[in-house]
């Protein structure tokens, strides 16, 4: 590999507030906020970033919160969300795409609770949705990958073929080809948000096929670690993963949810919450 070019730049998404009002004009006592996580918190990744936002929310608002991690996208998610609502959580954040239908179902039984779902597309009378235009960061990291590759083969470890993941894949290769028309992208699907073993295996396969820059849409650090082990480059996702690949890690698109969580809870407390759809980005 040649000496790394000075193109690396941390990319971040600061989610703007979702203007959300359950009981129009009536302030609400918010004693606890619930968070549902699809993977373990760990110390990097999608869930880790949401948990950082939760902690920031507690510190800024004085409202306590609780979470349940590693909740599967199925009937167990419905049970966890329902239990949070039954115990009186006035705001519940469900942070994975597959929770959407389960949260919508529960929301109809608890009209005085604010339900907020990440990355989905269905809304209800008291259920809003939020996401970020992650593809914007993907494009920029693709530019870096396109400049850094020597083999012109890029590798992508992906979870599920849902719109958000496909957007990221398309943006990444478009960014790469904007500076390197010869760049090609190979994708391996692991059908899991968090499976370090599969993520590592997919990374090794991609590198054996000639990929010298890897990225991922999964929740562990396995891809960055595999690239470090093999002397290749990697682009992190969700978090700064440079400590897992001091030589490999070029840059990362990082997610920052604290401002969104703070403003959402404050709006519920003030009584001016209403369910809306947020899709934040750079503009």
Could you say what each language-model-derived stretch is?
Residues 2-15:
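Bacterial N-terminal signal peptides that target proteins for export
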Residues 29-283:
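A residue-level marker of the well-folded mature domains of exported/periplasmic proteins
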Residues 23-29:
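Sec/Tat signal peptide C-region and signal peptidase I cleavage site
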Residues 13-23:
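Bacterial N-terminal signal peptides
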């Amino acid at each position: 590999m040649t000496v790394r070019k000075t193109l690396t730049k941390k990319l971040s998404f600061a989610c703007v507030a979702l203007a959300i009002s359950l009981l129009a004009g009536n302030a609400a006592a918010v004693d606890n906020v619930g968070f549902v996580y699809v993977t373990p918190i760990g110390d990097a990744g999608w869930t880790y970033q949401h948990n950082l936002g939760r902690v920031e929310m507690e510190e800024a608002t004085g409202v306590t919160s609780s979470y349940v991690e590693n909740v599967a996208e199925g009937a167990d998610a419905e049970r966890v969300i329902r239990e949070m609502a039954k115990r009186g959580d006035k705001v519940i954040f469900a942070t994975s795409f597959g929770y959407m239908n389960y949260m919508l179902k529960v929301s109809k039984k608890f009209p005085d609770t604010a339900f907020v779902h990440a990355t989905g597309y269905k809304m209800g009378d008291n259920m809003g949705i939020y996401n970020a235009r992650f593809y914007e960061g993907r494009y920029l990291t693709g530019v870096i990958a396109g400049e850094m590759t020597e083999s012109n083969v890029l590798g992508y470890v992906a979870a599920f073929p849902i719109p958000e993941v496909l957007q990221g894949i398309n943006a990444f290769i478009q960014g790469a080809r904007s500076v390197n028309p010869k760049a090609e992208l190979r994708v391996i699907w692991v059908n899991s948000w968090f499976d370090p073993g599969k993520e590592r295996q997919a990374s090794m396969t991609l590198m054996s096929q000639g990929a010298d820059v890897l990225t991922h849409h999964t929740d562990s650090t396995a891809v960055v670690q595999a690239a470090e082990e093999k002397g290749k480059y990697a682009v992190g996702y969700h978090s700064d993963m440079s400590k897992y690949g001091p030589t490999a890690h070029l840059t990362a698109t990082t997610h920052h949810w604290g401002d969104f969580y703070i403003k959402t809870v404050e709006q519920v407390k003030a009584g001016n919450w209403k369910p809306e759809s947020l899709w934040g980005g750079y503009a």
